C-alpha cells in the first residue's frame, strides 16, 4: 500500500485489526525486518509497518523533510490515534521524538536497541566503526554493506558470519536500498532541542529492549533511557545483537505482547 505524505510516496504494509501498532524500522533495514512479528501481532492488533522516506519502497524527493512530520502525516492519513509505537534503532529514536512532540498520540512505547537524538555514545568506541568508515570513505557500497552487516547483525563481539541465512541476505537487501538513497539531497529536520535532555517528559509506559550482543553505545543509550524515563522497564534478549526481533522472534514477540496487553 502507498500514500502520499508531505510530498513523498510512502509505502506501508497493514494487517490485522484492533488497537493500532506502528512498527518503525532500523536505519539498516526497512519494514520487512518486522515480518516475524506480523502473524503474532495481527491476531490482536492493527499492524502498520511503513518504509520510512528513502528506505524500502518509499521514495526520497530532493527536498527538506521531517521524520516526525512524516509519521504524523501517515497516522493522520490512516486516522490512527492513539497508537502503540515499536521502534528499532533509528526507528526507536523517531518513536522517542514523536512521543515528545505528540504525547497524546502515543499509548505505549517499545524501544529496541534504540537511538536517542542528542546523544553521541558511538564516538567513545571508534575502533568498532573503523571498517565501516573505511568502506564509506572509499565509496564501496558493497563493502560498506558487508561491514555494516557484521557490526549490526552479528554484533561486534561475535564472529563474522555468526548469524546465518536467510537473515544475512535479508539484511544485505534491506540495507542496500537505503545505501543507494541520496540523503544528502534531502536534508532532514530533527527535534530541537533533541530528545537526550527531554526524556523525563515521556509519559507513555515504556519498554526498553536490548540484545546482549549489541554495540556498547546502544547499551549506553538503554541505560540513559532507564535512568531518564519514569517507570521504564528493560528486557534483555540473550545471544542477540542489534536486531533481536529477527534473531529470536518468539521471545521478542512474547515479551512485547505481554507488555502491550497489560491492563
Residue ranges and their predicted role:
Residues 20, 44-46, 81-84, 105-108, ...:
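Structural signature of beta-strand start/N-cap positions in the alpha/beta core
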Residues 35-42, 48-90, 254-257:
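Active-site loop/oxyanion-hole signature of alpha/beta-hydrolase fold enzymes
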Residues 17, 212-214, 239-241:
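Acidic beta-to-alpha connecting loop that harbors the catalytic carboxylate
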Residues 231-263:
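Catalytic active-site module of serine/aspartate enzymes centered on a nucleophile-bearing elbow/loop
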Residues 97-101, 107-138:
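Flexible "cap/lid" loop of the alpha/beta hydrolase fold
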Residues 6-60:
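Conserved HGGG/HGGXW glycine-rich cap/lid loop of the alpha/beta-hydrolase fold
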Amino acid at each position: 500500500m502507498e500514500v502520499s505524505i508531505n510530498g513523498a510516496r510512502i509505502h506501508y504494509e497493514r494487517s490485522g485489526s484492533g488497537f493500532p501498532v506502528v512498527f518503525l524500522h532500523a536505519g539498516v533495514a526497512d519494514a520487512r525486518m518486522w515480518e516475524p512479528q506480523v502473524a503474532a501481532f495481527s491476531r490482536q492488533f492493527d499492524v502498520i509497518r511503513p518504509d520510512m522516506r528513502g528506505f524500502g519502497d518509499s521514495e526520497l524527493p530532493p527536498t527538506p523533510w521531517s521524520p516526525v512530520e512524516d509519521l504524523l502525516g501517515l497516522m493522520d492519513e490512516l486516522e490512527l490515534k492513539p497508537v502503540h509505537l515499536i521502534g528499532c534503532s533509528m526507528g526507536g529514536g523517531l518513536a522517542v521524538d514523536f512521543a515528545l512532540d505528540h504525547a497524546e498520540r502515543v499509548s505505549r512505547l517499545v524501544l529496541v536497541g534504540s537511538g536517542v537524538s542528542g546523544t553521541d555514545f558511538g564516538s567513545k568506541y571508534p575502533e568498532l566503526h573503523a571498517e565501516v568508515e573505511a568502506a564509506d570513505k572509499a565509496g564501496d557500497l558493497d563493502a560498506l554493506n558487508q561491514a555494516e552487516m557484521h557490526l549490526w547483525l552479528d554484533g561486534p563481539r561475535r564472529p563474522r558470519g555468526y548469524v546465518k541465512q536467510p537473515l544475512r541476505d535479508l539484511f544485505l537487501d534491506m540495507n542496500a536500498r537505503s545505501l543507494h538513497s541520496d540523503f544528502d539531497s534531502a536534508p532532514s529536520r530533527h527535534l530541537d532541542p533533541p530528545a537526550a535532555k527531554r526524556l523525563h517528559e515521556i509519559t507513555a509506559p515504556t519498554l526498553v529492549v536490548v540484545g546482549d550482543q549489541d554495540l556498547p553505545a546502544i547499551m549506553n543509550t538503554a541505560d540513559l533511557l532507564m535512568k531518564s524515563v519514569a517507570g521504564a522497564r528493560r528486557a534483555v534478549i540473550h545471544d542477540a545483537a542489534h536486531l533481536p526481533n529477527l534473531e529470536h522472534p518468539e521471545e521478542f514477540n512474547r515479551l512485547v505482547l505481554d507488555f502491550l496487553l497489560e491492563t
